[in-house]
Amino acid sequence: TFKFFVYTFVGSLMLLAALIYLSLQNPGGNSFAWQNIIRAGASLPADQQQWLFWLIFIAFAIKMPIFPLHTWQPDAYEQSPTPVTIILSALMVKMGIYGVVRWLLPVVPDAVAYWSDTVITLSVVGIVYASLLAIVQTDLKRLVAYSSIAHMGLMSAAAFANTDVAMHGLVIQMFNHGINIAGMWVIVSMVEQRWGTRDMRQLGGMANTAPLMTIALVIISLANIALPLTNGFIGEFMLFNGLFASASPYHITFMVIAGLGIILGAVYTLNMVQRTAYGDAVAMKAGGDITRNEYIGLA
């Protein structure tokens, strides 16, 4: 969408400006070498690190995205074909988190320490905000899009907690979230192909007409809400531990707000399962269950 282009273009320009400035600060001459960029950034006075922080952070916050720079994502996901949506949600948004951990944290460490509580606040507020919006969605794609924003908010908060357990949890959760969100998009695509709609008000009874698809939907949904024994649990558990171990004096408050988002996540996810898998609706009378090859692919 045009909004996606504008957000990405502006963020890219901000990141480019920051990197050019850092390269010019290298005492050994202009260089974009990674170690030289780190040395140049870490040696800058605090006031210069402050504005460099926001240039780099906004660029990566758009990619993740987190509140309040998230508005491009639901529209882009809703209007994109499924293969593109999978690439956006499973791969591209993870580059935002990777950029924060690999670039932002070591390049401007003083500014990160100063602004970390602010970013964590935005992240945990975004978890609750996106979860509340997901609850009122009727379009499956938009619901999954807001779900992804909530999950990225938790990852962002853990990244700026900057503890060892949070970093290990980030690696695990980025991988597992990529798998889970891709599976969710595949299920949504199958529903739309078979019954011609993503509107949950017109869906229902899938457990009777497509039991295998229902099983796949339930398993992926449980992983999405990080139920114990699913792949989503261990990473999310480590993210919460990392947030709790943060040096911030507000770490308990952050934990409580993020925990509320997890509860809301269970609400919108289980509501989605209830409205699509059970009940009775005309749209689910036609169509068919997933094939063996499709089921193997989902597995």
Language model: regions and residue ranges:
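Hydrophobic transmembrane alpha-helices and their helix-loop junctions in integral membrane proteins
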Residues: T1-R275
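Cytoplasmic/organellar membrane-interface segments at the starts of transmembrane helices
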Residues: S80, A210-L212, T269-A299
